[in-house]
């Protein structure tokens, strides 16, 4: 099985929690190709120097002292939308010349395809905004839902138990459909089990 793994470049958390997934598939003798940009992709390249990597369009978005201002949030949403479109278009160009059996995107909104089974990793099924930005929260949740519903599955790196979990209402704040698979916390310091609560990390590969 040939797998493309693409984490968001927003801090190193998205890339670092992809490390145990990459190790799992390599142990299964699958072919893994990395994709991303910036420090996030650099971390994966340093961790897996033997793997090929594809550079994706960069998302230039960072927190500032004005990050809780409405103007910043509106601009950030616009940048995210543009980045998602650019990511998706670039990915489709890659897929036109190279085939994959599975795409795993850690919060990289545009890394999915109708022609390849795609998985989205997030612990924020229900985004929570600062108080002064609460007016935008319904829109933020609707936008995020629109994005992850384009994927075949959503992997939530947390426990399914509503009384025993790490991300609280971010991942347990409402109803969700069959796409959600709570796979347990991911850490680069821990080796994955052969199965993760019914998710795809097992010996039976996805079929396209």
Predicted regions span which residues?
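Conserved nucleotide-sugar donor-binding subdomain of glycosyltransferases
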Residues: 68-110
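A nucleotide-sugar donor-handling region in carbohydrate enzymes
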Residues: 130-196, 205-208
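Short, well-ordered beta-strand core segments
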Residues: 103, 118, 154-155
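A short, glycine/small-residue-rich beta-strand->loop->alpha-helix junction that serves as a flexible
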Residues: 7-19
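Active-site proximal beta-strand in glycosyltransferases
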Residues: 114-130
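Extreme N-terminal starter segment of soluble prokaryotic enzymes
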Residues: 1-3
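Conserved nucleotide-sugar phosphate-binding/catalytic loop shared by glycosyltransferases and other
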Residues: 7-9, 28, 32-78
């Amino acid at each position: 099985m040939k797998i493309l793994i693409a984490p968001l470049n927003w801090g190193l958390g998205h890339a670092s929690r992809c490390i145990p997934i990459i190790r799992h598939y390599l142990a299964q003798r699958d072919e893994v190709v990395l994709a991303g940009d910036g420090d996030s992709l650099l971390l994966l390249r340093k961790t897996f120097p033997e793997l090929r990597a594809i550079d994706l369009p960069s998302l230039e978005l960072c927190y500032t002292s004005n990050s809780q201002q409405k103007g910043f949030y509106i601009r950030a949403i616009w940048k995210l939308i543009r980045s998602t479109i650019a990511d998706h278009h670039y990915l489709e160009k890659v897929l036109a010349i190279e085939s994959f059996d599975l795409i795993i995107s850690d919060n990289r909104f545009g890394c999915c395809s109708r022609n390849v089974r795609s998985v989205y990793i997030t612990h924020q099924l229900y985004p929570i905004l600062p108080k002064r930005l609460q007016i935008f929260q319904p829109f933020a949740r609707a936008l995020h839902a629109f994005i992850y519903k384009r994927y075949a599955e959503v992997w939530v790196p947390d426990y399914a138990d509503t009384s025993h979990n790490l991300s609280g209402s971010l991942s347990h704040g409402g109803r969700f459909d069959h796409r959600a698979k709570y796979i347990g916390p991911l850490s680069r310091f821990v080796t994955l089990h052969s199965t993760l609560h019914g998710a795809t990390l097992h010996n039976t590969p996805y079929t396209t």
